A protein has these predicted regions:
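N-terminal binding-site loop/beta-alpha segment at the start of enzyme catalytic domains
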Residues: 1-72, 80-84
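Structural preference for beta-strand elements that scaffold enzyme active sites
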Residues: 6-10, 42-44, 71-75, 128-133, ...
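Conserved, mostly hydrophobic/aromatic
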Residues: 11, 28, 45, 60, ...
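Short, acidic/polar
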Residues: 22-37, 109-123, 169-176
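Acidic (Asp/Glu)-rich catalytic clusters
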Residues: 63-69, 122-125, 177-181
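Short, flexible, mixed-charge acidic loops at enzyme active sites
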Residues: 85-96, 229-232
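Active-site groove signature of glycoside hydrolases
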Residues: 121-140
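Beta/alpha (TIM)-barrel catalytic core signal, keyed to glycine-rich beta->alpha loops juxtaposed to Asp/Glu
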Residues: 137-329
Length: 329
C-alpha cells in the first residue's frame, strides 16, 4: 500500500508520556487538541510502546477519542513488547517519569510483533494504525531480517497496516535496510539537520532511488538548534564547543534576516525531495502553537545562500528554497 499522505508537520508524542518532566492528563489532551486546531493542522501523530511504557499511547488514545479516524494519520512502533512487572521488579523509565508497572522486552518474533501491535491498538483505542515502524533495531539486525520485518510485511499484505518501515537515529543502518527490504517509509532522527548531514550522504540517496519516503525527527539535535547556549544538548549530551559556536553563528545569520534559528532548523530538512514530514514533540498546547508558527515563518532564499557563503552550510547540499518547497506542497 502507498504511504498515507502526511502533513509537513507532525506531532511526536513522547512528551505526552512525561518525558523528563511530568505533565497532567489535561495538559496531554490540550496538546493534542491544539494540534488539530492549529492554523496548519498537525494531523500526523507518532507514538510508541517504549514512550512511558505505554503511557504515550494511552494518553493519545484518550485525546483522540471521538475524533473521526479518517481525520488523522497515526503511527506507532514494534520491537519492544510490554509486559507486567514480576513481584519485586521496579519499572525502568529510561527518561520517562511516573511510569506504569511494566517492563520492555525486545521481541522480533512474528507472534511478538503481532502482540505488540495489538497491545498498541488497545491502548490507542483504535482498530488500526496507518504506519508501523520497527524501532531502534540497530543491535538486532539478524532477528529483524529473519522474523521481524517478514512479520511486519505480512501485516501489511493482510491490510492491517498501510505502510511499514524503520525508525532510529542510525542513518547508515536505515540505508542498508532500505536497500535490502521493501520499506515504505523511514523515520530518521537527528541525521539530516542544519548541523548533521550524515543522512544526506548515506540514507537519502537510496531512499530517492527506491522511492522510500522519509520522516525526520530530532530537527533540533536534542536542543542545540532550538536554543544554542552553554550547556545546551546535542544528541543527548552536552554540545561540544565547536558545534555550539557553529549553531550560534547560524543563529546570528538567521537573525540578520529576521528568522529564528528554530524556524530554519524545522524548514531545512525539506530541501531533499524524499522528506515528506517532520515530527516535533510538544508537551503543551503553547508548544504546539509555537511549532506551527516556526514552521510557517517566512524565510527568504537569501538567508540560505548567506549560510552557504559564510561556510555554515556545505555548498553541495540542497537548500529549501521557496520555489522548490511550493512545488512539493
Amino acid at each position: 500500500m502507498p504511504v498515507p499522505a502526511l502533513p509537513r508537520l507532525g506531532l511526536g508524542c513522547a512528551p505526552l508520556a512525561n518525558l523528563y518532566r511530568a505533565i497532567t492528563e489535561e495538559e496531554a489532551e490540550a496538546t493534542v487538541a491544539a494540534a488539530f486546531d492549529a492554523g496548519r493542522p498537525v494531523t500526523y501523530l507518532d507514538t510508541a510502546p517504549h514512550y512511558g511504557l505505554g503511557r504515550s499511547e494511552e494518553r493519545l488514545g484518550r485525546a483522540l477519542a471521538g475524533r473521526d479516524r479518517a481525520s488523522y494519520v497515526l503511527s506507532t512502533k514494534v520491537g519492544r513488547r510490554l509486559r507486567d512487572l514480576e513481584p519485586g521488579e521496579t519499572p525502568d523509565g529510561q527518561g520517562f517519569t511516573d511510569v506504569p508497572d511494566r517492563a520492555r522486552v525486545w521481541d522480533f518474533t512474528a507472534d511478538g510483533i503481532r502482540a505488540t501491535l495489538e497491545g498498541s491498538l488497545t491502548r490507542l483505542g483504535v482498530d488500526a494504525v496507518d504506519i508501523v515502524y520497527l524501532h531502534d533495531v540497530e543491535d538486532h539486525l539478524p532477528e529483524v531480517y529473519a522474523t521481524g520485518f517478514p512479520a511486519l510485511a505480512e501485516l501489511r499484505d493482510q491490510g492491517m497496516v498501510k505502510a511499514i518501515g524503520f525508525g532510529m537515529n542510525h542513518s547508515d543502518v536505515l540505508a542498508r535496510l532500505v536497500a535490502d527490504l521493501d520499506v515504505d517509509v523511514v523515520l530518521c532522527a537527528g541525521r539530516w539537520t542544519l548541523l548533521e548531514r550524515t543522512a544526506y550522504d548515506d540514507l537519502l540517496p537510496v531512499c530517492e532511488r527506491r522511492g522510500t519516503k522519509v520522516v525526520v525527527g530530532g530537527v533540533y539535535n536534542s536542543g542545540l538548534l532550538a536554543d544554542p547556549r552553554p550547556g545546551a544538548h546535542y544528541d543527548y549530551a552536552a554540545a561540544p564547543q565547536e558545534l555550539l559556536d557553529r549553531a550560534l553563528d547560524m543563529a546570528a545569520v538567521c537573525g540578520e534576516f529576521g528568522v529564528p534559528l528554530r524556524a530554519a532548523a524545522l524548514r531545512y530538512p525539506f530541501a531533499h525531495p524524499s522528506v515528506v514530514s517532520a515530527l516535533v514533540g510538544a508537551a503543551s498546547a503553547a508548544e504546539v502553537r509555537d511549532n506551527t508558527a516556526m514552521f510557517d515563518h517566512d524565510i527568504p532564499d537569501a538567508m540560505w545562500h548567506a549560510l552557504v557563503e559564510r561556510g555554515l552550510l556545505d555548498p553541495d547540499v540542497p537548500l529549501p528554497l521557496a520555489a522548490s518547497l511550493a512545488a512539493g506542497e
